[in-house]
Amino acid sequence: MIQDEIPIPVQTLQWKCIESKKEGKRLHYGRFAVSPFRKGQASTVGVAMRRALLGEVEGTSITYAKFKNVVHEYSTLVGIKESIHDILINLKEIVLQSDSYETQKASISILGPRDVTAGDILLPTSVKIIDASQHIATITTAIPLDVELRIERDCGYRTLNLKESQSGEFFIDALFTPIRNANYSIHSFESNNKVREILFLEVWTNGSLTPGAALSEASRDLIDLFIIFLNMEKEESIKEIENNELNIKNFPSTSISVDIDRMAKEVAFKQIFIDQLELPARAYNCLKKMQVHTVSDLLKYTQYDLKKVKNFGNKSVEQVVEALQERFAIQLPKDQFNIS
C-alpha cells in the first residue's frame, strides 16, 4: 500500500484508549473510543472492525501431535492420568506467539513423575509460550512422555475433528484467532447543530497480542481488502480487466435472484446490539429478559408480540418502533400478517 495514493479525508477522527487491563496472562482487555463520525458511519466501521477482529487477525496454534504406542485418541497410557483425548484438548488450548509463517516443529520429552505444563514444550526460537503454567498432563510414575508437535500460524478456526492414524498421529482442531471477544457500541451527541457519533470498541485477547495491536492488524486487513477499489477508475485497471477477460460475458448465464441488499442488512443486524437503540431502561430490560440482544433478535417479533410480554406496555412498544425507524429506517410489523 502506498500511503501517498490515499487521499486524506477532511473529517478528522481521533481515538483514545479508555481502559486497558490484564485480567490474567491469557486475558487482556481494552476499550477504545473513536470520534467524531457522521450519523451512520460509526455503525459501518463497527460492524467491519468486529468481523475483521474475529475473523482476520492471525494467531499461532498447535495443529498436530504424535505419540508413541498409541492406537486412538481415547487410548490411555499407563502412568499418565489423562487420556490421549484430554492431552490433545490441553494442547489445543496452549497460547503461543510467533511471527513466522513457516510450519514449526516442537516436542515434549519429560520423565515422570511430575506435572507437564506448557513450559515443558521444547520450542524453536521463533515461538514463545504466553503462559508456561498451562496444564498438559500428569505423569504419576517414573515413565517418559514423548510427543512430537507441529505449530502453524493462520486465522480463524480449522476443524479436523481430531482425526488420527494408526501410527498415533493426531491432527488437532486449531483455534488460531487470538481474539476472545469483540464488541462495539455507538453513542450520539450534538456538535455545531449536527448529530455526531462516538464508536466504542471493546476487545479481549488471549495475551499473545494486545487489544491495541489487534485493532491495528484488523485495520490493515480491512485496508488490504478495500484498497483495490481506489484505482478502479484508472485506465490501467480497466485495461487489466479487459486483458484478463473479466467481463460480464464470462459469468454464468444463470441469473442470481438473491436479494443482496436484504442479505447484507440481515448480516449487519446480527452484529448490532440493542444498546444502540438507546431505549429507556424499562423497554431495554424487558428485551434483555426475552434474550433479545441484537437488532436481528428484535426483528423476529412483531408489535403485537411485544405487547403480550409482561411489563412491556404500549409506550415501550412505541419507543422500540420509533428507535428502529429513526436509526435504521426499519418498520416493525404490527402483526404476523404484515410481515413482508
Swiss-Prot record:
GO cellular component, one term: chloroplast
Range of residues in the leader sequence: none
Keyword Transport part of the UniProt annotation: no
Alpha C-terminal domain (alpha-CTD): annotated segments: 264-340
Subcellular compartments: Plastid, Chloroplast
InterPro entries to which the protein is assigned, alphabetical: DNA-dir_RNA_pol_insert, DNA-dir_RNA_pol_RpoA/D/Rpb3, DNA-dir_RpoA, RBP11-like, RNAP_asu_C, RNApol_insert_sf
Family: Belongs to the RNA polymerase alpha chain family.
Name of the protein this chain belongs to: DNA-directed RNA polymerase subunit alpha
